[in-house]
Amino acid sequence: MAQQQQQQLQQQQQHHTSSINNNNNSILLLQQQQPQQQQQLDQLQQYNNNLYSQNYNMEEYERRKRREREKIERQQGIQIDDRETSLFGEPRRVTEGDAEITAALGEFFEARVYINNQTVGISRSAPGAGNPRLQPNMPPQGKSLGHSPSSASASAAAGPTSASATTALPGQQQQHYQQQQRPPTYVKQADNKPPYNGRGGYPGQPMKNDIPSSSGMAPPRGPPRSSSSNSNSSSATNNASSGGVPASTPLGPPLSTQMPNGREKSFLGPPAPALHNGTGGRFVPPAASKRPGVGQQPPPPEKDVNKIISDIANIFTVQPLTLIAATPHAPTRENYNLLAPNKQKYAMDIPSSPPSAEPSSLMTPLFAPIASPIAPLVTTPPQASQLPLGGATSGTILAGEALAPLHQLPPTPPKAASGVTSPGPGKPLKTEKNHSLEKQDSCLENDLELSESEDEQRKKEGRSAGNSSNSSESDSSESGSESSSKNDPQHHPNHQQHHHQLQQQQQQQQQQASMQQQQVLQQQQQHRPQPLTSNGAQNKKFRHEIIARGSNTITGLLSSSGFGSGGSVGPAGLNSSAAMGAGSGSGGTLSSGGSSSNKTPSPTESNKWNLSRFFHKPANQTNSENVSPGNVSMKVPGILPGGAQIIPESIDVTTAIVKNEKIHDDHMAMEDGEEEDDDEEQQLRYGGGLSVTPVAVKKEAIDAVSEMALGAIPKTQIKRESAEALLSARLSDSGTSASGSSSSSSSSSDSAVGGEVVPKLGLGEILQLPGVPAAITTVMRVQPTQSQKAPPSNSVTLTPILPLPTSPKQRQKKPRKKKAVTSAPILDSSDDDEPPPKHPGLDHTAVSVQTPPAADTVKKGRGRPRKQQQSGGSGNLSSASAGSSSQTKGPTLTAAKKPLAKTPLAMSRARKREHSSQSSSNGNTPTKKVATPQLVAAPLKPTSVTAGSSSSDEDSSSSAESSSKSSSSSSSSDDTETQNTNCRIVKLNKTGAVQKKALLGSGSSSPSSSGSEPEDQTTRSQVGSGQALAQQLPPYKQLPISQHSQHLSSSECSSSSGGCTAVCSSSSGEEDEGRREKERERKPKSDKNKISTLTRIFNPKEGGAKKQGQVVIVDLQEEQQQGKLDAAAQPPPPQAPPAAPAAIMAKPRMTPTQQQQLGAGLASPARTTTPHLTSLICKIDLSKLSRERIMRLKKLTPAQQNGHLTPKDQATNAVHVPNGYAGDTNPATKVKHEHPVKPEPELDAGYEAKFKPGNVKQEFQLKQERDRDRERERERERERDREREQPPGRRRKRSSSSSSSPYKEKKRKKEKADQLQIGKELLPVPVLLPSNNHERMPNHDRLSYDKLQLLHEDAAAVIGDVSAANGSPTKKMMVMSPLPPPPTVTVAPATCNEAVQTTPPSATTASATAPPVPATRLIYRSYFDRDVEHPSDDPRKNNQFLQEAISRKHAADLERDSFNQVTLYLEAVVYFLLTADAMERCSSEQATNTMYKDTLSLIKFISTKFRPYQQQSTTNIQHETHNKVAILSLRCQSLISLKLYKLRRKDCRAVINSLADFFRVGRGDIANGNTPSSISPSNSVGSQGSGSNTPPGRIVPPDIHNMLCKENEFLSYLNSAHELWDQADRLVRTGNHIDFIRELDHENGPLTLHSTMHEVFRYVQAGLKTLRDAVSHPTHQSQ
């Protein structure tokens, strides 16, 4: 039978030689290799007797029918199982790994879905389509699926990999893969619809990302050609994630040889010999593989494939900085990293094969480090090990199946038939397209690996690494880790660290039997030098594009001269494939990418290291959106949402924190070139991999439990983090965030801030980082956070945190400090720790650092996250920011506080915090602070300034509102205290004190509090924005929403933004109240003594707890009541806070980046204070204290409130500040004051160097003023208490006051006085802040050059402005933001000072300032204040903008996914606008006009892309996103039309004047002359008729006609501008997108018809980032 089948196959292939040239070669190879093939076929027959015989005996007609069926199925999102089934025949031998592989692949589906939705510029094919890249590399041996034994194995490998379902259904596939033609076998593939979309890259599947991925999808029908696989990086990524078996053809069957289905047609011949050569006959592919019936369809010509691949490669490789280009790659690579482990396992035989001589040399170093974590490989040692090809590449589950095909493929290269055919075209494609694909892979891979590896880690923790990094690690757990450690020396130390992490993971995995088995297989495979790397390292090195795919890495490595770019050894070495694989991949599911890179860093690969960098970087994040994945997102690590990764990360982060610092910085200034080499590896470890792998490794305490939790955690959460990281990275790359991906962006912005910047939460619960545009920063939206709320419970986010929402905030804070992007993974873990906070806003605050992941984490880990942190995994990530918060009890927070205090810089803080939190969360966590940990955590993360309030709010939603106010305020106070040297005062945010703060920091706070109540959200948003320098404008909205929440958020914000500020304002108000309480409540002496003792013990100044302890008294119930009371009482106070809102307003107006940087500068003091968080925190339940004082505090009069207005005043002020700009500004200022006052003594040298000089002076003055202010405040509080004895108010105030014992209240009063003085001394503080901003600026360099320049200019301006104590902070903000509110600045100076001061030295001062604040705080900044926004643009910048625009447009042209394409186009448009704007200054008017016109035509074309979606119901998430893109597009069109009119306004004026003269004079002859009736009736009838028919009128001279035409043109532009604007407004209202637009307005300043092109750029970029994050989150959820 085997012989007959082979003969039939050969005959059929010969018949089809005309259509399949490569098949002839493969047939020849088959003939030569028939003896071996027969053996293989015999084996194959055992698996695939019936179906194979049917498939191979199929005629052309049958094949065509089958192709049609497959196409239809693909269109339906169902991957055809035919080839996959046959492919499974061989892999099925690997029974041990089947279950594990299935579990892993099942997770991959989710990851693929995420990639499809999340990644931009990457099209996703069905696994087959993605595999095509690998497939082209694969010999097309099986004409159909497995015509020849080797083809069967290769196609089997490709099939399983291509079928996402294979991951989910490994067992089934093994049973059915013999029956290639049975698609039902892949019913699960429906789950892979997004990834499988590209499987058949035929244009008919526009929705599927795969098709769009390559401009030249080879077959229009479902299965993409090898070329389409090559061209479709996303599809390759998907395939890799599912299992990129096609990659198994390194030498590869020519790309064309592969069937459109992804099957290799005539390649069977070469594979069999390759099998014999490479495998040495270990595994004989089943004879069924010969059967031509299944996959003999001719693959598209190689020309098409090469062209597509080259085009894609050119587009993406040329633009490493392009966030879009880079972002897609990282996720794809992560997907491949997940698959890579299997590939490496199966690649073992390949190195031995002659064709893989080069590869094997490289491969041998690689050791197939990415041993798939699938135990089945062990079970299938003979064939699986023999088949290093597709099985390993295809994916964990597909490992067995893929092995045979891949193994066969390696022999094929020796034959040189397929090797010769495919390598030539493959290499060029590889060189060009590998980069682009690699980039996409890195982003996608990060996304996939984050979610999938997280899930896999959870699932496989017992078996193997389980994560993509785990899978890669598990495969290479021993040998792989060894190889990675060996290879690491070649690579950056990051890889070595990653190796350590991997080794740790491996150790954990080794504990598991399946893990051990996999390791054995891995070792065996590693001995076979197969170059499979979990990443797409092969892709970069491998000639074949398929190899470029991570899953195809084995074949690719073989094809590319044994680079083993599979992400294992060599490939990682060359590109940053290792970094990509290690960082991206490792960041994703595991540090599989990282380990892979560590394992695969072969010298040969080191040349291609650059490609990995690009992919690697976006992966880091995620992030951001999101780091992110590392892309996922710099903002927030993708894994955090699950929480599982977070726990491991804290340990890993700790180890790699030093390098992470660098990574964080790189992310902050995420320049693809430089950062990607070092950073990518680091990011791979930390950010790129979302530090998930490190988390898994380091969270050994969590180990199986935590990883299992990760497995339980929805991949949406994990991937979401990756996606976020990726998004933030993208945004950064695009210049919005200056980060490779959204996650990166958030993480980077956060990192930039270090502990220093206070992130702001926007209305949408977006965390605003001072240096990062709000949109970019806000990778995670409120909705994503909410959607992820449930996941957090699943996520490893420590469940212990649940009891104390505050603890998550600490984590958030840590990410802040960590903000140095790589902290994206850290952020994720911190988010996981944070999940206990229930408010999306809180999560967002944390998320803002790593935006999307944090949100996921927060939501996921509400209950569990703390446990995980306690377990030590997530605690490590957020240990710095949420060390104690990571543990619900907050012990880590206390430990984290010390590190925070120690690390002045955000990055150093992040690292130290991570280390300390790791240690503290693992062993240092004192459980004293149960409720406060979260509170402190929020403050700890200046980024999560609002996190403090939101965390407490999340804890008890409305009831927590009040408590969150006091507890979060106190915790934020603690944070500030830690940041500021002291702040050991137990700071209960009193309503009065908090309110002002809320105004100041309400912007950031709002998102965090959004979870609890709208009011809280608004308040917190204001606080956060104030902290982040009004990065988010939502504060104005938030202020009105919840006055009491404003109080909470304000205190939180002030404390978070500036520990001193929050402490001082709350301490002045609260101390006054506390004093009143002392006087009024007169708590029993026992209580007073206790409080006093506690305060002394934990008061740094008192020397307790080594001066690092803090006592946080939180009364959730009290605070809840207070929140309600404040809400009722806030109407009166709003007037006082307006000044702060005005200041905030100024900030919010600032460019997102500028705002964020300003926020960073202002917030940096907060972070500075954060380091001062005491390691010892005592949390006292206010319920145990008398509550009368709280009531009194509530009722404090505005005068008593001093710096903080009464809740009513705050509400009024907040309301008055529509955008909350003033509020934001004030909080930032407050933060400055706080930091100068308290944190400095305890600040690290670096931090002190930045802030201490001014702070020291301020401290002395503050100390002096404190005594005076304390006395004054005490008197005032007494009076106020007497006045405000009303029970409700008293209770609230009492909570704050009670929490702050009389002793604490005194200290708070002192701090208030200090802060007042600080306000007076604002000049030094602002100066310090500007310097901080400048320091952070480099972090934000990733932002568009335009933004960077603006930021730098703004920072300089801020420094200059610092001279003015009051006006300077606000002015800074104004300078920083394109829309700074100068009037606000003018009016805000006092307000800002107050904000910074947190409270004037005396209540009187506060009261006096408060009234002016409303007057001073103009909701909108002056229109004339932004004229200085862009003082100059240099021509080089224009070129850069133009290049960015062109690169994005080309990427969009090739993009198949509608959403990704539209977003890429719109990004290109805004870059074109920046180019045209620059041309206005240095080019001719005509050239500028032409540029705008062309841009307008382009955007009009783009608008046609989302019209179909606009008409559909907006309930559909996709339609909602398209509607939002349409809104942004309409706004751009409107402003472009207006610009075109303005450019020609002079001409228009002249024309109008001329026409007016013409019409006024009435000259012009009547059409028929003076005699309407023609000259004479005798004229010809014709003439008469014509004359009579001529309508009466005037003859218009040609010049007048021309002028009329011009006038029509000019006025048409003007009319279009207003009409399009109105259309956008209508769409906002009808589509219910008001919140989305309001959020963007708060973050970036409202977009108006007066907005400049730079403002349009920032606004649109922020909106696109937000949308990408939103798209990625649903994907995670669905997964």
UniProtKB/Swiss-Prot annotation:
Protein name: AF4/FMR2 family member lilli
Family: Belongs to the AF4 family.
Ranges annotated as DNA-binding: 859-871
Modified residues (Phosphoserine): S451, S453, S829, S830, S879, S881, S1368
Ranges where the record places region Disordered: 1-21, 55-78, 124-305, 406-539, 580-609, 733-755, 783-1172, 1197-1319, 1569-1594
Composition bias, Low complexity: 144-181, 212-244, 464-484, 502-532, 733-752, 868-906, 957-973, 1001-1012, 1042-1068, 1569-1589
Pfam family, one: AFF4_CHD
Role: Has a role in transcriptional regulation. Acts in parallel with the Ras/MAPK and the PI3K/PKB pathways in the control of cell identity and cellular growth. Essential for regulation of the cytoskeleton and cell growth but not for cell proliferation or growth rate. Required specifically for the microtubule-based basal transport of lipid droplets. Plays a partially redundant function downstream of Raf in cell fate specification in the developing eye. Pair-rule protein that regulates embryonic cellularization, gastrulation and segmentation.
Composition-biased stretches (Basic and acidic residues): 69-78, 429-442, 1073-1090, 1234-1251, 1260-1288
Any one Gene Ontology molecular-function term assigned to this protein's record: DNA binding
The gene coding this protein: lilli
GO biological process, one term: regulation of cytoskeleton organization
